[in-house]
Amino acid sequence: QVGFGPMTYGFSYAPYNDLKAFEDACTENTIAIMIEPVQGEGGVHPATKEFMTGLRKFCDEHDMLLLIDEVQTGWCRTGAVMSYMNYGIKPDIVSMAKGLGGGMPIGAICATEEVSKAFTAGSHGTTFGGHPVSCAAALAEVNELLNRNLADNAKKMGDYFSTKLEKLPHVKEVRHQGLLVGVEFDDTIGGVDVKHGCLDRKLLITAIGAHIIRMIPPLIVTEEDCDKAVAIIEDTIKSLEK
């Protein structure tokens, strides 16, 4: 959160994947819980199924809404059309952007019929939410994603890619959900060093924290593409050992 303050008023915060901490953070005035199904900026930490199903149950028992942020995880990125579908739950409100527009700026929210009754005209608007060009692009994008069943490819290739990455030297842990992949190295390998080395070798990745890299490959990625990426990362790691 450094560099993004001051934080929005009215929120209480709790440790990720800690259901009891979330329950303890709620009061009689709490109206909703908002959560990312995968913490991408934190180093790719997927929520556990127990955590997500527990949140849904807790919200139901206390008449609270469950809001899920799918801006980064939505539209086939995680091996399902929406990441929450991996957990077998149904949220009350879902926010989405990024993958929805296929490169065009757009934002949208979806809500259950019951929740949407509380909306008035414009109350859920966004700058590019209803722009006709962005909406046309989003419609084409969604049709392409669904017709080509790219969620299944994301799941298959995410598993394949992660299995290959786990075999690389100095890899401490690989975390992924579909094609949202994080690799944590041991203390001898810096994430920024790997990022720069990969960029020199024409592979674009990003670094998070001291020893983590994050990759978000195209949804149409193939095994051959994954193999090339792994080879570049391995070559970069070996160059850093010298």
Task: Tell me the role of every PLM-derived stretch.
Residues Q1-K242:
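Conserved N-terminal phosphate-binding loop of PLP-dependent enzymes in the Aspartate aminotransferase
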